[in-house]
């Protein structure tokens, strides 16, 4: 299929090409994509390449803003039939590294969410607002990015800062004895380097001194010794 080479170069998303760019009735820029990655025709179950296309489908993954404003992505891709008789998968749709199957965000947008919090020092709420993504999505992206970039052993610090974040409402469930149990606490505690320079150390659900003490106890044996006793005490006392 023909595509706009200049627009594809500018859009720069691996595995796809821009076939058309236009504005819809509301003035939103619409970017139509087609697949260029030949491996997208391989069955994700058995790996065999298909040569029989069943239909075209359109998905609308969200991407980074372009030119300072969001764009509406419409990826026109094919549904293929797997002809391998030993494979239980009948059909599959194309996927590329930046847009896996059933993904609602491009990989680079998800990565930008994590970088904004872990590397950029923005709160989850602020990063979500800036990038147009919901709190849960940014939070998961933050966890994923942190696992990739944070060292296995936490760097030492003399002071820990606590950042309390609230998301949504508490979720409760009723137990057989009529009592209620908290299933999801809306409050989370983030542990950061209060001396500056080392960013986020970790995050736990809850908003109590017990949550702080539990997190400290789970750290490597050598690590809490570097935290000033006076500062650690004030840190725990600061939690209700």
Question: Which ranges hold each PLM region?
Answer:
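Short, charged, solvent-exposed linker or helix-capping segments at domain edges/interfaces
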Residues: 43-44, 92-95, 202
């Amino acid at each position: 299929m023909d595509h706009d080479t200049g627009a594809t170069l500018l859009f720069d998303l691996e595995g796809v090409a821009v076939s058309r760019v236009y504005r819809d009735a509301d003035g939103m820029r619409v970017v139509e994509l087609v697949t260029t990655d030949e491996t997208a025709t391989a069955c994700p179950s058995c790996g065999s390449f298909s040569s029989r296309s069943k239909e075209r489908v359109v998905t609308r993954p969200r991407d980074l803003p372009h030119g300072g404003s969001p764009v509406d992505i419409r990826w026109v891709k094919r549904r293929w039939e797997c002809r391998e008789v030993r494979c239980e998968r009948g059909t599959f749709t194309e996927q590329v590294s930046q847009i896996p199957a059933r993904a609602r965000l491009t990989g680079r947008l998800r990565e930008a969410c994590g970088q904004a919090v872990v590397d950029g020092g923005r709160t989850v709420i602020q990063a979500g607002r800036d990038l147009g993504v919901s709190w849960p999505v940014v939070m998961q992206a933050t966890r994923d990015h942190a696992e990739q970039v944070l060292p296995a052993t936490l760097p030492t610090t003399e002071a820990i800062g606590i950042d309390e974040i609230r998301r949504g409402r508490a979720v409760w469930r009723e137990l057989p004895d009529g009592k209620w149990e908290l299933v999801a606490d809306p409050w989370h505690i983030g542990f950061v380097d209060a001396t500056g320079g080392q960013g986020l150390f970790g995050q736990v659900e809850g908003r109590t001194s017990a949550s702080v003490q539990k997190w400290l106890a789970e750290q490597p044996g050598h690590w809490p010794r570097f935290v000033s006793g006076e500062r650690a005490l004030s840190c725990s006392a600061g939690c209700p």
